[in-house]
Amino acid sequence: MTHFETLTSDEIQLLEEAIPLIAVLIAGADGHIQISESDWAAKLTHIRSYSGLEDLKEFYKQIDANFKIKFEEFVKFLPTDTDARQKMISDNLSNLNKILQKLDPLVAFHLYTSYKTYAKSVADASGNILGFHYVQNEEKPWLDLPMIHSIAEPV
């Protein structure tokens, strides 16, 4: 992952773990994480490993290899209380801000945008009713990932 060579292995791990954490954040916002939400989040991760932005394909390949294990670990070890879980995930994701600043501005923008579109895609799946995408009210406050500072597209 040549775009991440300025980062430590711990920082790269935090960036990678953000994907299953975002999936748990969105899927669990209503207090119930369904198998279909977990499966869809895993499928999204896999799709992004071969389709999408070229500079993030290798990143998603790394995540795809262990996504289900990480997702299940987070569900198992994070608090079962929804508010406590959401806060813990939010606090964890806020640690990405310092790491994203170390990246090339375009890569940071792509990664930030990718996190947000991933969150939206997970929400669409969890609220899919008769083929219509519906974002549940509990998910709405988390969709823009307010704990991660906005990154503008470089000029």
Which role fits each region the language model picked out?
Residues 1-28, 32-155:
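Small-residue-enriched hydrophobic alpha-helices in membranes
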